[in-house]
Amino acid sequence: PRADSAKWGGATVPPLSFFERNDFMAEFTNANTVSVAAGQNVPLTETAVAGKGCVVHREGAGIVTLRGITNQCKARFKVGFGANVAIPTGGTVEAITAALAINGEPLNSATATVTPAAVENFFNIYVTSFVEVPRGCCLTVAAENTSTQTVLFANANFVVERVS
């Protein structure tokens, strides 16, 4: 079938619009290699895809604000974070952990752990989680270094998608 206007009984039918909800997506990145201290957020320096008013971010900050702008009881977002991680030169070789944090609290269900064999040995991590924001409220989400030492983060990518 055609998805355009056609004559039906002498009337013109307007074109069909297919909404795939991709207008509610935002992507924030940091292509540089940055040192992130233990317990701190990964800074996001570029906005690859700007979101609508329900996703708010300030360039260079590590925090993204999700707003519950909805007519339903809650707005649901899918939040994902990926990066390459390594222990910097001079650090102790041990497990590296990073997690998504909601309002500053790391999520155990969205924690990535890798154990490198040596310093400067990069591994790729990716975590994702669904976040529900009550109508009229706001939550902050971030990617946090939950390791016990400073970690290098390279090519960080933070994606927020409004799913309902």
Residue ranges and their predicted role:
Residues P1-F24:
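Short, Lys/Arg-enriched N-terminal segments with co-localized hydrophobic residues
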Residues F18-S164:
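Extracellular jelly-roll beta-sandwich "head" domains, especially the C-terminal globular C1q domain
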